[in-house]
Swiss-Prot record:
One of its GO terms (cellular component) is glutaminase complex. GO terms for molecular function: glutaminase activity; pyridoxal 5'-phosphate synthase (glutamine hydrolysing) activity. Belongs to the glutaminase PdxT/SNO family. It comes from Streptomyces griseus subsp. griseus (strain JCM 4626 / CBS 651.72 / NBRC 13350 / KCC S-0626 / ISP 5235). The gene is pdxT. This is Pyridoxal 5'-phosphate synthase subunit PdxT.
Length: 197
């Protein structure tokens, strides 16, 4: 891998464009990923926000679920925001019928924990590993983490709830940093991808 990592954004649903822009601003070569062969060509992957049940079903429908699981198990760096966080969880406290996860982070999440769409909000969040003060977190029907395993590091909390975690090469936030123009969380992820190679 060159100094410029190739990072994909799972492009089944969600704010793909915003993640592509954030990754490019953090000095990565960013590209959408829709098929298993595209997944095989990236050094790391962002799983964006969206609707977690729909994303899970689309990943199965498009033949992406097993390749995603295999790459994450093999150590590919992965970053999930909001619904992406849910997909990276080992367990969902309140899953919808037919909802599957990729796994990769030893955590239990609660879907839509911060409320409905009209209860969305922005908040300053101190994120471990991100310098320069708090990041502006956009919480849209956001999950929170109920509990983590011994290998999972809590890197941010808001209102007494876990909203960002890291486990080895996996990162997850319940908020959307890509919607704010502050790309420091993406820069942290790009550094994680670089460190693997």
């Amino acid at each position: 891998m060159s100094d410029t990592p190739v990072i994909g954004v799972l492009a089944l649903q969600g704010d793909v464009r915003e993640h592509l822009i954030a990754l490019a601003s953090a000095d990565a070569l960013a590209r959408p990923v829709r098929r298993p062969e595209e997944l095989a060509e990236v050094d790391g992957l962002v799983i964006p926000g969206g609707e977690s049940t729909t994303m899970s079903k689309l990943a199965v429908l498009f033949g992406m679920m097993e390749p995603l699981r295999e790459r994450v198990r093999a150590g590919m760096p992965v970053y999930g925001t909001c619904a992406g966080m849910i997909l990276l969880a080992e367990k969902i406290l309140d899953p919808r019928s037919g909802q599957e996860t990729v796994g990769g982070i030893d955590m239990i999440v609660r879907r839509n924990a911060f409320g409905r769409q009209n209860e969305s909000f922005e908040a300053a969040v101190e994120v471990g590993g991100v310098e320069g003060g708090p990041v502006d977190g956009v919480f849209i029907r956001a999950p929170w983490v109920e509990s983590v395993g011994a290998r999972t590091e809590v890197i941010a909390e808001h209102g007494g709830h876990i909203v960002a975690v890291r486990q080895e090469n996996a990162l997850a936030t319940s908020f959307h940093p890509e919607l704010t123009g502050d790309h420091r969380v993406h820069a942290l992820f790009v550094d994680m991808v670089r460190a693997v190679n």
